[in-house]
Amino acid sequence: FDELFGRAVATYLTFNGTGANVMALTALARPGDAVICTDCAHINVDETGAPERVVGAKLIDLAANDGKLAPEQIADQAHAIGVAHHAQPAIVSITQSTEWGTVYSADEVAAICDMAHRHGMRVHMDGARIANAVAASGGTVAALRAMTVDAGVDVITFGGTKNGLLGGEAVVFLDPMSGARGQF
């Protein structure tokens, strides 16, 4: 994965996508945190409540436009930062490609990452179907890097089972220091 992303990364293997997403979010979240995602996000709809139960973070599910989250939606949620009565928006989770089959462009991902980082939030990409997004965006390593590491994504779950493997996913922390807690 270091070679694929063109830099040193911290990588951990998991059995399935739910485990990968839970591991990634747990490494980034603290008690009282919230994860911003779309209302159709896999972590919100299909993972049997594992992200909230295991991670202990509230999911804030926002209306998707063609399956996508917009930077303005992140900015709208930033009002809760520092308010003692609200879960603290700390992580933005996007899915690439989305549950609707749409693909975020590299520029869209970069805009989301920029908005999240401006508000002190980290960005998680559920990449169960990342190979499809890369294929739709040119099919090159450069396309993968443009929509992940170059755009500012902090952690990606890299799909194996939806891309032909019998079992297994990878959690890739694009900043190895962010992934230091992943091993625990």
Regions found by a protein language model. Name each.
Residues F1-F184:
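Conserved PLP-enzyme active-site core in the AAT-like
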